[in-house]
Amino acid sequence: MLQGELCALNKSSNSLFAMYRILLIVSVFVWNVSAFAQSGKLVGTVVDGSTGETMPGTRILVEGTNLTTLTNFDGEYSLSAAAGTYTILVKSFGFSNKSISGVVIKPGGETSLNVTMEFAKGEALEVVTITASASRENVNALLIQQKSLSSVSDGISSESIRRTPDRNTGDVLKRVSGASIQDNKFAIVRGLNDRYNAAYLNGAPLPSTESDRKAFAFDVFPAALLDNLVIVKTASAELPGEFAGGVIQVNTKSFPGKAFHEFSFSTSYNTITTFKDRLDYQGSSTDWLGVDNGARALPTNMPTSNQMFQLTSAERVQVASKFKNDWALQNKTFLPALSFQYSGGSSKDIGTKRLGAIYSLTYNQSNQYNTTRRQSWQNAVGSTEESLMESDLLDDNYVVNTLAGALANISYSAGPNTTIGWKNLYSITSQDRVLMRNGTRQPIDAPNQVLRQSARWFTNNQILSSQLNGSHYFESFKGKLQWLASYSGISRSVPNLRNTLYYGDTDVPDTSWRAGITSTSVGPDYSGSRFYGLNLEGITSGQATFELPLDLVDLGIRNNLKVGIGGQYRDRTYTARQFGYVLANFMTFDQNLLNAPIEEIFGAQNMNATSGFSMREGTKSSDSYLANATTSFGFIQFDSRILEKTRLNWGLRAENFEQNMYSKTDNNDTVQVESTRLDILPSVNFIYSIDDAQNLRISYSRTLNRPEFRELAPFAFYDFQTRYVVTGNPSLVRSTIDNFDARYEWYPGKGQVFSVTAFYKNFINPIEQATREDVVTEYTFVNVPKAVDFGLEFEGRLLLSTLFGKPDHKVLNKMTVFANYALIRSQVSLNLPTAADSIRPLQGQSPYVVNAGIQYQNDESGTTISAAFNQVGDRIFIVGSSQEPSIWEKGRAVLDFSLNQEVNEKLSIKLTARDLLAPDLIFFNDIDNNQKWSEGDDQMWRSNFGPTISLGLTYRL
């Protein structure tokens, strides 16, 4: 079975690659339509001024002409007209008419006009007409959409993304209020561990990208493919129940306003990487695409694990001879990073129908070199004595990162009341790494021992997301129906991770290096180990929501009912195999072979049953597992405006969750987890509108956090970078969180915002990663009884003209300062006498998150300059035990700079600088228990980084 699962790697890669080709074909055959030279387009969105919701079925008329159209399900409209200046009339039943003057339509251009409508009471709805200018109306529409959301949320638009140096979605997340990034890819919202977030792509759930943690790596999506990114921080009945930090909604582009082509190219220089020497090894011819072509696969006709354990010594020698001698390392040079991207799109109006497509291809290859000093210590928890160093190692890391993606979205509007969309995204990320480790092991009461270790491995992630969605508006009773069916699949493979380990003696001058190989044991602690891992996961989901207004027009009462049902099925297959070279015959083995260099020691000439090596299977029965989970849900939600200034969004969500996991222990005993749980999740969001620009929000919700498949499985995996073994815990249970939020927000206009939020979260049975009591070099996952998390979050995005009280100042009106600061405290209640800290923060919780920056934007000259700063506070990485103190991560300060200059309407140049401060990344034992890095703490790992300077060109047709 294991062999068959590993063979599935090539099949899955081929099928995903086939989908990649299909997306390319779609992009090639989609037509492009050019605008007529003497006409232009008027496009925009109509929203309800009191709720911020879009208004389908609204009539748009061009006064003095016969031109008219209706908004579609999403409140959007598109209207072609001859070039000129017009007055636009907007009508919708139940709302005052709106007349907008001074609307300019340019030849061959596209004019954006977003409109807000005011709810009318009684007889006034048929006679009142409100007039406004085009420029002011656009600003008002943006303001209304920002302030009228029922949930607390923050986000960033595609236009803002273009002004940053960000390459992928992980970089973009750092710009969102209260968010930060760990390991350059995992989201931290309000300082909470990444496990408390939910990731959604165009409304459909995304599976975990990691085989060993509950997290989604947001670096898999190129930033150029995004339409917007929103983090919802408070729950409502329509949102998934499993989150406490935020629901991260990644939305890709759909209907283009007009036909376009865009080509981008950039290159970058890293101060400690580019043009420096690097070590490499023989990989495959398709590594540059981010995929392995099979060069790292297991040899053909390889015996299964069970068969390997039955082989004779001579037969194991034959198996050893099947493997290539692929251990040699080569000297190369790190070249500058390269990035290419093409995006295109078009739309065609066919009467009242509209067909549109957006497609994109992106490719990015970057390099990274850094050093990491790794130390381990012997120290008693709470002891005042100086710690004794057990090991002192220095890692040289040589990494090549590849990211490739394709997007193809097709949308069809069958008139103003029906829209069908098909959205597809395929992404490949890979990391090709060589690690060289040198240093000293100094066991207590033993001679010093030096080691030289090398590891080389290739990690590949492939994600395919495809979804079909529909939106329908029923004009007769103003009902809205939305449905979605989607599939997301992830393939994560680590083919042929190879490790060598040589030992020497510091007491012997010019020591000879000997490979650490025995006659019986194999694994990451021995030379010549090979590891093959494959994780296949898929999510199939579907949902439907229906929305109906229940307004009492005569009383001026607005009420909206939304109900929905849906479900998702998620399954995972994880398989792993491990091999290692051993002495075929201890008595007759040629000991001189252990002194052979890396490139020679495992050559075919050294595989024999008397004086050479054979191959032994190191796979354990716990190294594979199968798991699946089924979630079915239903919700009912009311959005009510009882008084003019008050709004109440409230509802109930029911989620039935069934989870199954099947595995084995190392002793081949069956491990089976079968659980079913029905949860009723209430949510209430109250909004009081102080005036047109200010809101006060109060909310409560109950949410969940469920154990990940990997966290339940007893599989043990050795992490070369941390030197820890990670194991699962089948006894984990789901956690519940009660969330309370209060927020004041002010929108002074022109895209400005200021807000203050207080939040409190009460956790029951939160899940943490903690050091095992019996093995201090292993960590697992545990439930702690209770925890609380509370804090304040400040956000501001203001023009300098507003700050200095000079609204008409030309320069200050072009400069925006933005900042958000989250101050967070958490406390875990421990009933465990063996806990490392009697009072401590929640694992992964940062005490503060800071994002700040300044931007200058001159539309006349086409110049945009921005600088952004991000930092988080020190946080617990791994919870300690009675034998071992907790490991903490020191927060890094990140400073980025960007300059974008439009040369003309088609060409722009972008200069960026990332991580200008480049502080070291430090993990440490908090010896003095002050919950931060300070002199006297034991340093565990310390990695260095260098700034990256990039130069890019973008050309638009």
PLM region spans:
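Gram-negative outer-membrane beta-barrel transporters
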Residues: A758-N762, T780-R875
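Periplasmic N-terminal accessory/gating domains of Gram-negative outer-membrane beta-barrel systems
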Residues: V104, A134-I188, D194, G203-A237, ...
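Outer membrane beta-barrel strand-and-loop segments of large Gram-negative receptors
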Residues: G523, N535, G542-T545, L593-L594, ...
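Transmembrane beta-barrel wall of Gram-negative outer-membrane proteins
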Residues: K41, F323-L435, L464, V684
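Short, acidic, small-residue-rich periplasmic hinge/interaction motif at the N-terminus
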Residues: V47, R59, E63, K91-F93, ...
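C-terminal beta-signal and adjacent terminal beta-strands/loops
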Residues: S801, V817, Q871-I878, Q901-L957
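Surface-exposed extracellular loop regions of Gram-negative outer-membrane beta-barrel proteins
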Residues: A204-P205, P597-F613, E658, Y688, ...
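Periplasm-facing N-terminal accessory domains of Gram-negative outer-membrane beta-barrel systems
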Residues: F36-V127
